[in-house]
């Protein structure tokens, strides 16, 4: 037997309906805020992610599915969506008429990680990006939309945490202060943090190692080093969040695993998923578009993990009910049931039937399995008079209806 690859999961009927609900809710909510969908390729040039995410990040160093194709091109299965969206934005000059764009995407991402609850090698994200605006009202609106989305799913437990990572003007001084702080505590850091404490010191604040958490507990905070512009931006973002009625808390230790973030960063976190506490995360990336060869256009966005959202939805039932199950007794009745089913489906009615000519008792059990709203029973007598018994499965009420798609549809819709 050939089995699937570790960390690459099938989404089966019964579960896929939960995913469809997650995706449909995103489309509905995002459209309220003026977002349009963009579809991006799974395979990109490796250089895209090296330039955007950063050479010293865990993703680039350890986790990317990269290979050289038959044309000797270095390519990578996308580990995240923002870089691909920005590459498309630049390549197709979406900024030519208006630099402001509101885009969302959904689909699989790939990282070579140790599979565990809520973390897989093929995982799925829904993300949204806004380009062309630095106004903190946009930061607040993006965060408000994210919280609105989770509220629409009925998930109020994840809480919003925000921080500011400053800008190229104020971050270098903070970065040096953090390097000096870490240098005095190198013996307490994990090997990864020791190796890159000079090239990517902020990652030590986000390290999952208990030793690193303890060693950095008293580390300087970026919020204390913000320049006047970044401080004003963060203050205004918080003010607009409060005006929007969006609840948040400040987490001054929050950093992101991608190098392109500036100023506002955020996470939606929960205590219900163990170590995988973040279900959505993002931030502002005002230099990314120019770093990728485009104009100096700012941006902000987020991504959320579909698998983690599905876990939070728990045992909620999302499988739809067919409108009608047709139980047919005998070959002629089967033929009539098939004709009727096709006509009903063309009229927008969801219909199932039995194809094997089993007993009425067996077919009624099958109707129960499908959880159909109604069952139509057709036998020889029904064929003779051109009418059949329609049973409402929730109430048990039975009525006789003519055997035409229009008459049956009128009784059940």
From Swiss-Prot:
GO BP of this protein: histidyl-tRNA aminoacylation
Any one cellular-component term (Gene Ontology): cytoplasm
Superkingdom field: Bacteria
Catalytic activity: tRNA(His) + L-histidine + ATP = L-histidyl-tRNA(His) + AMP + diphosphate + H(+)
Coiled-coil zones: none
Pfam families: HGTP_anticodon, tRNA-synt_His
Record's subcellular location: Cytoplasm
Single GO molecular function: ATP binding
Keyword annotations of the record: Aminoacyl-tRNA synthetase, ATP-binding, Cytoplasm, Ligase, Nucleotide-binding, Protein biosynthesis
EC assignment: 6.1.1.21
Matches recorded under InterPro entries: aa-tRNA-synth_II (IPR006195), aa-tRNA-synth_II/BPL/LPL (IPR045864), Anticodon-bd (IPR004154), Anticodon-bd_dom_sf (IPR036621), His-tRNA-ligase (IPR015807), HisRS-like_core (IPR041715), HisRS/HisZ (IPR004516), HisRS_anticodon (IPR033656)
Transmembrane regions listed in the UniProt entry: none
Main location: cytoplasm
PANTHER family: HISTIDINE--TRNA LIGASE, MITOCHONDRIAL-RELATED, HISTIDYL-TRNA SYNTHETASE
Oligomer and partners: Homodimer.
Family under the similarity heading: Belongs to the class-II aminoacyl-tRNA synthetase family.
Protein name from the UniProt record: Histidine--tRNA ligase
Organism lineage: Bacteria, Pseudomonadati, Thermodesulfobacteriota, Desulfuromonadia, Geobacterales
């Amino acid at each position: 037997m050939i089995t699937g690859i570790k960390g690459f999961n099938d989404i089966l009927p019964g579960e896929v309906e939960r995913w469809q609900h997650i995706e449909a809710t995103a489309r509905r909510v995002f459209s309220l805020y003026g977002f349009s969908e963009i579809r991006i390729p799974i395979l990109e040039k490796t250089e895209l992610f090296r330039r955007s995410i950063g050479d010293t990040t865990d993703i680039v160093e350890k986790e990317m599915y990269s290979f050289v194709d038959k044309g000797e091109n270095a390519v990578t299965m996308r580990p995240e969506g923002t870089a691909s969206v920005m590459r498309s934005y630049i390549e197709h000059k979406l900024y030519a008429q208006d630099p402001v764009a509101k885009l969302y995407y959904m689909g699989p991402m790939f990282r070579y990680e140790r599979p565990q609850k809520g973390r897989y090698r093929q995982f799925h994200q829904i993300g949204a990006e806004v380009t062309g605006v630095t106004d903190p009202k946009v930061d607040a609106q993006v965060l408000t939309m994210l919280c609105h989305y989770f509220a629409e799913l009925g998930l109020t437990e994840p809480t919003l945490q925000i921080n500011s990572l400053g800008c190229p003007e104020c971050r270098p001084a903070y970065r040096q202060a953090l390097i000096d702080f870490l240098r005095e505590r190198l013996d307490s850091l994990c090997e990864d943090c020791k190796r890159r404490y000079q090239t990517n010191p902020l990652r030590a604040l986000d390290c999952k190692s208990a030793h690193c958490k303890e060693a950095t507990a008293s580390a300087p905070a970026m919020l204390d080093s913000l320049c006047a512009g970044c401080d004003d931006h963060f203050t205004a973002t918080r003010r607009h969040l409060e005006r929007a009625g969006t609840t948040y808390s400040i987490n001054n230790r929050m950093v992101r695993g991608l190098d392109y973030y500036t100023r506002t960063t955020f996470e939606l976190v929960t205590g219900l998923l163990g170590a995988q506490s973040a279900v959505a995360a993002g931030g502002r990336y005002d230099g990314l578009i120019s770093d990728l060869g485009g104009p100096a256009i700012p941006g902000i966005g987020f991504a959320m993990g579909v698998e983690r959202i599905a876990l939070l939805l728990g045992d909620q039932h999302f499988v739809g009910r067919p409108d009608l199950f047709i139980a047919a007794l005998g070959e002629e009745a089967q033929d009539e049931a098939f004709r009727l089913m096709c006509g009903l489906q063309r009229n927008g009615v969801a219909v199932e039937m039995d194809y094997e000519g089993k007993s009425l008792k067996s077919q009624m059990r099958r109707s129960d399995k499908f959880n159909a709203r109604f069952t139509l029973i057709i036998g020889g007598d029904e064929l003779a008079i051109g009418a059949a018994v329609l049973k409402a499965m929730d109430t048990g009420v039975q009525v006789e209806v003519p055997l035409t798609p229009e008459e049956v549809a009128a009784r059940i819709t």
